[in-house]
Amino acid sequence: MSDQYVWLLWSSAFLVPWGIIYISFPAHRRAMLWASLFTTPFGLSEPLFVPEYWSPPSLFDLALRTGFDIESLIFCFGIGGIAAVMYNLLTHRVPVAVPANERERPLHRHHYKALAAPFVTFVPLYFLPWNPIYPSIVAMAVGAAANILCRPDLKWKTGIGGLLFLIYYALFLVGLEWSAPGYIDRVWNLSALSGINIAFMPLEELLFAITFGMYWAGVYEHFTWRKC
């Protein structure tokens, strides 16, 4: 397979389980769609990572020519909705509204500060002399911690959700290496990373997966005042 279309096919592959779950579990559709619509715009951050983190051949060579690409939007849409509902699918729980009296608790005074934490964290860290994947990982970890501090009831969902998404994402990395052998070596800027791989998977990809899963596992409930 030509490397030109690998990123498109791999990002689109995330839409398959998304679609199956969306159709099969109507009770989780709102959370999935909400999360995916919020994560999709993060695909526009691709110029921050090309070529510092990786240089994926893309449709019309957009990534290499402009930093932007269509595939990143597809990718961000596909992973957001799944990360938001994996824990709920495992536990067979559906989020319900938080009672009004609970919203008045002292911890919830920091509701919006907690939600803003990863974005506030990322900006100053981005300007440090390191690869942009690292401030992304730290920012999501801070966001996950802030979610738990503000909403302690989300601690299990955050932790288990992160592990579930790590496993899910690792399976997609396996599929990527199987369908396009050597693609990770050719496309990721491995010389600019830690050099630590788990099998063929860069440690940074796995750290991205677990922190992304931890943060987005609880954002829907936190932002919309719901709980499982």
Task: List where the protein language model places each region.
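Short aromatic-rich membrane-water interface segments that cap or initiate transmembrane helices
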Residues: 1-3, 61-78, 191-207
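Membrane-interface helix caps and helix-loop-helix hairpins in membrane proteins
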Residues: 1-2, 123-133, 151-152
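Hydrophobic cores of alpha-helical transmembrane segments in multi-pass inner/ER membrane proteins
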Residues: 10-19, 73-89, 139-145, 204-220
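Membrane-interface helix-boundary motifs at transmembrane edges
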Residues: 22-34, 96-103, 149-159
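Hydrophobic alpha-helical membrane-insertion segments
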Residues: 34-42, 159-174
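A generic, lipid-embedded transmembrane alpha helix
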Residues: 37-57
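Alpha-helical transmembrane segments and their membrane-interface exit regions
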Residues: 41-44, 139-150, 168
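Membrane-interfacial, low-structure loops and terminal tails that flank and connect transmembrane helices
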Residues: 93-112, 227-228
